[in-house]
């Protein structure tokens, strides 16, 4: 069943994959997809947030089997739950093969779920986060749809932003304009990218500013369109992202200012975690 808004807020605030959902309108909580659903935390997050229909896409059948076997612990979210449909599939292929469009695309902590040898993760091909992938995700979103991607640390988030912006650029959309579609939340452990199919409304921007006032963030990694320069310090706004929104910095400039390689990547060289 559904939970009340106040209870949902309490449950969503501790997890960065859920925090942006506090800004999503109630009438845009119909169709959601989790790419790399793993053990199901993102599925539970969407259930708490009140989404009506959730496609849980997981390429590893072992994860699906474990969650089903532990139904008493997991709440049976992979066991014929009335609001969840489980798909054993690769995320991008799944989205390409369907005509369905989503109010929300959620991807949380995929490296922990997919890389057996964490020490070699930089050499692992990952087609989920290339700029080509972001174009496909945008195609899978409804007109007012959003996408949430939870990263692990600062430079992963900046590379996510680079790939998202390159995706827009390939469609002929200028960086300055594309920044109207982007929010970043600089949680110390799980910095998060939020992408919206259309520019964020003033109401949504206010909602994100309220979130930044509520949760602890640090390291100047936040960005919400429309925050005035005088407020940058209060909101821990990232200076590079602010400069891009103002039209004063391009993708090459962002990469040049970073202490690791945060430039965009393509399907031809999909080494997202190769940052050094």
Positions of predicted regions on the chain:
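General small-molecule cofactor/ligand-binding pocket signal
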Residues: 84-87, 183, 222
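Conserved S-adenosyl-L-methionine
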Residues: 172-188
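Short loop/turn motifs at secondary-structure junctions
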Residues: 28, 50, 100-101, 143, ...
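Extracytoplasmic/lumenal ectodomains and periplasmic regions of secretory and membrane proteins
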Residues: 230-276
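Mobile active-site "lid"/loop adjacent to the S-adenosyl-L-methionine
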Residues: 62-63, 70, 74, 81-82, ...
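Class I S-adenosylmethionine
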Residues: 1-76, 81-82, 163-168, 172, ...
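Flexible, glycine-/basic-rich loop-and-beta segments that form/coincide
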Residues: 180, 190-250
């Amino acid at each position: 069943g559904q939970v009340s808004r106040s209870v949902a807020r309490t449950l969503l605030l501790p997890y960065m994959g859920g925090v942006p959902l506090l800004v999503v309108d109630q009438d845009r909580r119909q169709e959601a997809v989790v790419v790399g659903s793993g053990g199901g935390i993102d599925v539970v997050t969407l259930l708490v947030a009140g989404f009506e229909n959730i496609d849980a896409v997981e390429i590893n059948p072992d994860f699906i089997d474990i969650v089903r076997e532990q139904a008493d612990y997991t709440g049976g979210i992979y066991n014929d739950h009335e609001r969840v449909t489980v798909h054993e599939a690769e995320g991008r292929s799944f989205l390409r093969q369907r005509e369905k469009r989503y109010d929300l695309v959620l991807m949380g902590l995929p490296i922990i779920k997919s890389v057996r040898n964490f020490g070699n993760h930089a050499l692992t091909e990952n087609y989920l986060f290339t700029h080509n992938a972001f174009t496909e995700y945008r195609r899978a979103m409804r007109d007012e749809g959003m996408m949430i991607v939870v990263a692990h640390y600062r430079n992963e988030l900046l590379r996510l932003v680079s790939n998202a912006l390159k995706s827009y650029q390939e469609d002929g959309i200028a960086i300055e304009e594309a920044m109207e579609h982007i929010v970043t939340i600089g949680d110390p452990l799980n910095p998060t990218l939020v992408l919206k199919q259309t520019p964020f409304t003033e109401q949504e921007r206010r909602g994100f500013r309220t979130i930044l006032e509520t949760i602890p963030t640090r390291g100047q990694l936040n960005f919400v369109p429309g925050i005035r320069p005088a407020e940058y310090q209060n909101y821990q706004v990232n200076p590079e992202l602010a400069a891009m929104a103002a039209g004063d910095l391009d993708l090459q400039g962002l990469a040049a200012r970073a202490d690791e390689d945060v430039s965009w990547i393509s399907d031809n060289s999909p080494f997202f975690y190769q940052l050094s």
